Amino acid sequence: MASFRTLFACVVILCCVLWSSMARYGEDMEVETEMNKRDVGVACTGQYASSFCLNGGTCRYIPELGEYYCICPGDYTGHRCEQMSV
């Protein structure tokens, strides 16, 4: 069974992905979405800042959970931006 920390991290990341998907429906929402995604966690530092995310993704860290995730550019998806969007 998943721990609460893992479950919470999945919910936070899922919310970011859903916001990202919704951004494609309007320019105003896209601006709001980009701001909301960047408000979750803090910028990664050290080796994670330059190597955790792939394909130009931006690394974010959630200190309360000790979890890393990526904000992916439009053509990529996945936990580390490892998959091309279809």
UniProtKB/Swiss-Prot annotation:
Residues 1-23 form the signal peptide. The keyword Glycoprotein does not apply. GO terms for cellular component: extracellular region; nematocyst. Residues 24-36 form a propeptide. It comes from the Eukaryota. It is found in: Secreted; Nematocyst. InterPro entries: EGF-like_dom. Residues 40-82 form the EGF-like domain. Its main location: secreted. Disulfide bonds join C44-C59, C53-C70, C72-C81. The keyword Disulfide bond applies. Keywords: Cleavage on pair of basic residues, Disulfide bond, EGF-like domain, Nematocyst, Secreted, Signal, Toxin. One of its GO terms (molecular function) is toxin activity. Belongs to the EGF domain peptide family. Has both toxic and EGF activity. Its EGF activity consists of rounding cells (morphological change) and inducing tyrosine phosphorylation of the EGFR in A431 cells, but with a lower potency that human EGF. This is OMEGA-stichotoxin-Sgt1a. It comes from Stichodactyla gigantea (Giant carpet anemone).
